[in-house]
Swiss-Prot record:
<comment type="similarity">
    <text>Belongs to the methyltransferase superfamily. RNA methyltransferase RsmG family.</text>
</comment>
<feature type="binding site">
    <location>
        <position position="75"/>
    </location>
    <ligand>
        <name>S-adenosyl-L-methionine</name>
    </ligand>
</feature>
<protein>
    <recommendedName>
        <fullName>Ribosomal RNA small subunit methyltransferase G</fullName>
        <ecNumber>2.1.1.170</ecNumber>
    </recommendedName>
</protein>
<dbReference type="InterPro" id="IPR003682">
    <property type="entry name" value="rRNA_ssu_MeTfrase_G"/>
</dbReference>
<feature type="binding site">
    <location>
        <begin position="126"/>
        <end position="127"/>
    </location>
    <ligand>
        <name>S-adenosyl-L-methionine</name>
    </ligand>
</feature>
<keyword id="KW-0489">Methyltransferase</keyword>
<keyword id="KW-0698">rRNA processing</keyword>
<feature type="binding site">
    <location>
        <position position="80"/>
    </location>
    <ligand>
        <name>S-adenosyl-L-methionine</name>
    </ligand>
</feature>
<dbReference type="InterPro" id="IPR029063">
    <property type="entry name" value="SAM-dependent_MTases_sf"/>
</dbReference>
<feature type="binding site">
    <location>
        <position position="140"/>
    </location>
    <ligand>
        <name>S-adenosyl-L-methionine</name>
    </ligand>
</feature>
<comment type="function">
    <text>Specifically methylates the N7 position of guanine in position 527 of 16S rRNA.</text>
</comment>
<keyword id="KW-0949">S-adenosyl-L-methionine</keyword>
<dbReference type="GO" id="GO:0070043">
    <property type="term" value="F:rRNA (guanine-N7-)-methyltransferase activity"/>
</dbReference>
<dbReference type="Pfam" id="PF02527">
    <property type="entry name" value="GidB"/>
</dbReference>
<keyword id="KW-0963">Cytoplasm</keyword>
<dbReference type="GO" id="GO:0005829">
    <property type="term" value="C:cytosol"/>
</dbReference>
<keyword id="KW-0808">Transferase</keyword>
């Protein structure tokens, strides 16, 4: 279990090259500065930004094979987890979906500043996004599982990998959805918190 900022930084460094680490350092610096202007993340979490946001996002890579297609991140907010993934693996195509204007501006600015040619921002509600096939679907603190699956099912295929950090509610939320959806997922322990878990799944979420 990651317990310190140093451990979190080392965890991330093991999963990307030096250029990736430089991009992540730049992202952290920009986040600290932008958070003075808009509430991208809670002030309290900035003191543990590597544990709470960066490593928390980076750990999803351990559940995803390297060759998957488009990584679709729903409700990216400040960029977690999608922007972190895009910065660590610039060969991975990533689409960040976010509806709030100021957050869309922040994400767009960061994609430009970090020179992430692999990463696009869809500044709109997910409901309005044109259907496309996603190799990976991620979403942290986006919506309750039932709603999340209903909104994103149309982007999934038989080979889609789902990585859904769900905090302490993971197992309970999974029990609350229909059996056809339960079958797709299992619960993985988060490495950033004893209490948190990630719903990892594979396949098409039929509606
Ligand atoms: C609680 S925040 C989480 C942000 C980020 N994923 C994180 O974990 O730090 C949820 C984000 O989802 C966005 N959002 C909520 N509903 C959405 C929708 N239907 N389409 C696109 N974005 C949405 C919100 O604007 C907000 O930025």
């Amino acid at each position: 279990m990651i317990a310190t900022e140093e451990q979190a930084r080392a965890f991330v460094a093991e999963r990307c090259d030096a250029a990736g680490m430089e991009r992540i350092e730049a992202l952290v610096a920009a986040l600290r500065s932008e958070n003075e202007r808009q509430n991208l993340v809670s002030k309290g979490s900035l003191g543990e930004v590597w544990q709470r946001h960066i490593a928390d996002s980076a750990q999803l890579l351990d559940h995803v094979s390297r060759e998957t297609g488009l990584w679709l991140d729903l409700g990216s907010g400040a960029g977690f987890p999608g922007l972190v993934v895009a910065a660590m693996q610039p060969e991975k195509p990533v689409l960040l979906v976010e509806s709030r204007r100021k957050r869309v501006e922040w994400l767009t600015d960061m994609v430009k500043a970090l020179k992430l040619e692999n990463c696009d921002v869809a500044g709109m509600r997910l409901e309005l996004l044109e259907a496309r096939e996603a190799g990976v679907i991620s979403a942290r603190a986006f919506a309750p599982l039932e709603k999340l699956l209903r909104l994103s099912a149309r982007f999934s295929t038989d080979t889609t990998t789902w990585v859904l950090p769900k905090g302490r509610s993971a197992a309970q939320e999974l029990q609350g959805v229909s059996r056809k959806w339960q079958k797709l997922f299992h619960v993985e322990q988060s490495v950033t918190s004893e209490e948190a878990a990630i719903l990892v799944g594979r396949g098409r979420a039929k509606t």
